[in-house]
Amino acid sequence: MAWHDGRVVDDDATTVIQDVRPWGGDPADVGVAGDRIAWVRPAGTTPPAPGAEVVEGRGLLALPGLVNTHAHADKSWWGLPWQSYGGEGGTQGRIAHERARRDELGIPSAPVAERVLREYLRTGTTRVRTHVDVDLGLGLRGIEAVREAAAALDGAIELTVVAFPQDGVLRRPGVLELLDRAARAGAEHVGGLDPALIDRDPVGQLDGLFRIAAEHGCGLDIHLHEPGDLGAFEIDLILDRVERDGIAPGKVNVAHGFAVVDVDPARRRDLLDRMGALGVTMTTVAPVRMRQLPLAEMDAAGVRFGLGTDGIRDLWSPYGDGDLLGIAWQYARAGGMVRDEDLRRVVELATRDGAAFVTDEVHDLVPGSRADVVLLDAENPMDALVRRVPRSAVVAGGRVVDLAALAARPWE
């Protein structure tokens, strides 16, 4: 603290975000020192020190940075001219089409990934868990490209990587070894994909993945689109191995997990109770025309849950714009959520509670947290969600983001 013009000022905060309403509460000022929130105090009570950067909040709603827990930042044509949808439908058809065209589009590369990350940042996402393709044609090149892209943003986005075998594991000899190499090289997680429908060997695929996790201490994040009893059986196989190996809570995630909503209520309750007890998490991209994962049941069972954009504007689908708040809206709307407590809970998933998929740190508007702050012209979190309010300002890792500089048209 110091005196300036006869008043006590804070000389630690290098940036002060003035007159905002954290989570829609009372007006406050937020002091930022380096990349951390230093303090949160009633608005107007602590003038900024001379030379401090000031962000005029004008009474806007303040939320923690958005968290994208299931992304594919390596494989978009964002920033390129329109690419017409081609190839066959279904998982196998999309895999084949992607492999036929990705090289001509520069997928993967650092420029591709950086364009995607910049769009995430423009809409307020500051933490990302991204799946990155690992296969015999690419090796680990995609992971290197995504890491380079994140570094180019100089810490604005905190990112963790899932080495993802999009084309299968056992059906492509050598991929399991690539996943092992990725884990040894520092990939935080290793992925899997539909062990029965893709590899035709759920036990073999899962045993291979869990062996890598045991050897390297990495997490597992497994795409599981398989429906009904088949998918539920595979979730049981995953849970059996988590229990057998004593894997710590939060280290194993089931992405999509459509089977959870397909099975009858008693079977679903058993699955969720076991997942909650073992600390196995779930992520969803809130797919349209499908039943959504049951938030109230998952909360009751203690299953931690995150939201993600999936791929955006890519060779799988032209849809998607990278706005995690839009995915949160889609999840809430498709799930018929209208009560304040449910709408606010979805905003918490998209911000504060989603961060555990990327970091062990607290992610909130409190002292000590990384200074990731999003300002929106909204009455409260519920209003921000249902109107998908544009972001008025973004502070990422303590630095004010130049949103105008990031505002490029998707084809440029």
Per-range role (PLM):
Residues 20, 35, 59, 70, ...:
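Divalent metal-coordination and catalytic microenvironments
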Residues 76-109, 234-253, 271, 321-338:
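Active-site gating loops and adjacent loop-to-helix segments of metal-dependent hydrolytic enzymes
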Residues 1-49, 381:
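N-terminal metal-binding scaffold of metallo-dependent hydrolase/deaminase domains
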Residues 365-412:
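C-terminal cap of metal-dependent C-N hydrolases
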Residues 244-252, 296-378:
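His/Asp/Glu-enriched, well-ordered alpha-helical/loop segment
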Residues 77-131, 137-152, 177-184:
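Alpha-helical scaffold segments that flank or form the walls of functional sites
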Residues 156, 163-172, 184-293, 304, ...:
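Active-site core of metal-dependent hydrolases
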